[in-house]
Amino acid sequence: MVLNWRGVKSRLYSGKRRIDGRNKGLIAIRSRGGALKRKYRYIEHYKQKWMDKWLFVMRIEYDPNRSAHIALCSILKEGIYFYVISIAKLEVGSLIITSALKLGTLQVGNTTKIKNIPEGLLINNIELIENSGSKISRAAGTSSLIIKKYNKKYSLVKLSSKECRLISNECYATIGTVSNIERKLKQNKKASYSRKRGIRPIVRGLAMNPVDHPHGGRTKGGVHWKSFSGKLAYNVSSRKKTKMTSRYIIIGHRKQKIMDKQIKNG
């Protein structure tokens, strides 16, 4: 197996071209650039390829391109290797499976349709559209909660952003929480921690010249806060009002956070 792995390794990795916050040569995100070189690991987000096949977890690795850890899985009989996002409490040597049918045991790491998962269970790597691959709850320590089965077609799911939305029962999801839960406790004690990740120092717009930023120049106040490109900032929604998926949002994340505060205050 080791000899086979040495040959397959080059097919799971590739070089990664650094964008440094640019889009077609123009600055899209300020204060980005200068990160360490890294190789990109190909992650399998569409697990329906390996339907009803047992996947053997060979090892759990660190991935510099994302906050969560990744797990190297293999189908031993066929000699196939690929990476998936690792789940918390997933151990080396365990077996996981993807199935469209109802699973006998709700083991952490198994993937199935939302209609087969009971209410009150934490899930991650959720599809938004059927057979489109996982899109939601892929960052470290994130998970979503199935609140209730809304009807035969949809389930009401509470995302990690506190947003409550309807998701089709035919969409696939993985049971459990994404790995590396302790990442939120990590502190950047030195500037080099940020520079190695490609985050450069941020200059306030107020300290710039008028030609460089809407807040620049001696005159203070008189206008609403804006971004460097001139768009309104601070407590202004950037989501398109005509977006098709807005019809599936029952409670937005802003409204849900206000409701949670009111419940705590009594």
UniProtKB/Swiss-Prot annotation:
Family annotation (InterPro entries): NA-bd_OB-fold (IPR012340), Rib_uL2_dom2 (IPR014722), Ribosomal_uL2 (IPR002171), Ribosomal_uL2_bac/org-type (IPR005880), Ribosomal_uL2_C (IPR022669), Ribosomal_uL2_dom3 (IPR014726), Ribosomal_uL2_RNA-bd_dom (IPR022666), Translation_prot_SH3-like_sf (IPR008991)
GO terms classed as biological process: mitochondrial translation
One MF term in the entry's GO annotations: transferase activity
Ribosomal protein is among the record's keywords: yes
Annotated SUPFAM superfamilies: Nucleic acid-binding proteins, Translation proteins SH3-like domain
A GO term from the CC aspect: mitochondrial large ribosomal subunit
PANTHER family with a match to the protein in the record: LARGE RIBOSOMAL SUBUNIT PROTEIN UL2M, RIBOSOMAL PROTEIN L2
Protein name listed in UniProt: Large ribosomal subunit protein uL2m
